[in-house]
A protein has these predicted regions:
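Short low-complexity, flexible loop/linker segments enriched in glycine and/or proline
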Residues: 4, 84-86, 183-187, 205, ...
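Short, highly charged low-complexity linear segments
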Residues: 75-78, 160-172, 214-224
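FMN-binding flavodoxin-like domain, especially the glycine-rich phosphate-binding loop
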Residues: 1, 6-14, 18-135, 139, ...
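Iron-sulfur cluster-binding cysteine motifs and their immediate structural context
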Residues: 148, 153-181, 185-202
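A mid-sequence, solvent-exposed acidic-amphipathic segment
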Residues: 123-156, 160-161
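Long, positively charged, glycine-interspersed low-complexity recognition regions
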Residues: 193-231, 254
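Conserved short-loop catalytic and cofactor-binding motifs
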Residues: 13, 45, 91, 149-150, ...
Length: 254
């Protein structure tokens, strides 16, 4: 259990894993003590959709005795190459550009202390976040399909970035354990592009390292993977709890 000193307003920014917030994030939030918190907004970036994640976020808020202020989604370039194709660099940049209006609306809601509009919630959404999510984790979120080529230099980058300490070196080559959350940081940040998942290499993620910055409102789009990189910030009466486990991630920082 961890304790985080916050203002009354908390914004949780997180990727979408299997149409809900990552289990590792919900587990952390369930155990963490948010000292001073009264209201919470959830901001989720995704490759296409968040399903019925709002239902489970609302349950988390109730568990924490926080006023639930809604869940918002921001579509970012797909990076989950275990199942889906990643866009090329130009397409990825266009997706980021197209997300700006939604991001502005999200920021306006937060600034004005308003609830987010209710997201879509149809039968498909409920099915994906409900029935599919646990099956997805059980059947797909595994590390046994990760391999590395002979070009690996044993730099330990993947070991250092893994948020779950699931990678170790054996004879200067990475070995994946069983505790994997499929953040893909080991692939996206391999300096020699040697990490492979079922034949997909790092070059499938062409937005790696690119950043899109906007100065007309307090936002920073970060498409850089960071492994476990939790940042707790208090800015202007709002506390931003950012959980980064994958690329790309959206950070609101001001």
């Amino acid at each position: 259990t961890s304790s985080v000193q916050t203002e009354e307003n908390v914004i949780l920014v997180t990727p979408t894993y299997a149409w809900r917030i990552p289990h590792i994030v919900s587990g952390w939030l369930g155990k963490a003590e948010l000292v001073g918190a009264k209201r919470i907004w959830f901001v989720m970036d995704c490759g296409s959709e968040i399903g019925n994640a709002a239902k489970y976020n609302q349950e988390l808020a109730a568990q924490k005795a926080l006023t639930y202020m809604g869940t918002a989604q921001i579509v970012m370039p797909e990076n989950y190459i275990a199942l889906f194709p990643a866009p090329d660099k130009q397409e990825a940049k266009a997706i980021v550009e197209n997300a700006k209006p939604a991001i502005r609306s999200i920021i306006d809601c937060i600034r004005n202390g308003m609830e987010f509009p209710a997201p879509r919630n149809n039968l498909y959404d409920r099915f994906m976040s409900g029935a599919v999510n646990p099956i997805f984790y059980k059947k797909i979120v595994k590390a046994d399909a990760f391999t590395v080529s002979d070009a690996c230099i044993g730099c330990r980058k993947c070991v250092q970035l893994c948020p779950l300490n699931n990678i170790r070196l054996d004879k200067d080559k990475p070995v994946w354990g069983a505790n994997c959350t499929h953040c893909m940081a080991c692939i996206c940040y391999c300096p020699k592009e040697t990490s492979v998942y079922k034949g997909y290499k790092q070059d499938k993620i062409e937005m790696r390292g690119d950043r899109a910055e906007m100065s007309d409102f307090p936002l920073y789009l970060n498409t850089v993977a960071g492994g476990l990189d939790r940042r707790d910030q208090t800015i202007g009466g709002f506390s931003f709890v950012v959980k980064i486990y994958a690329v790309p991630v959206v950070e609101i920082i001001g």
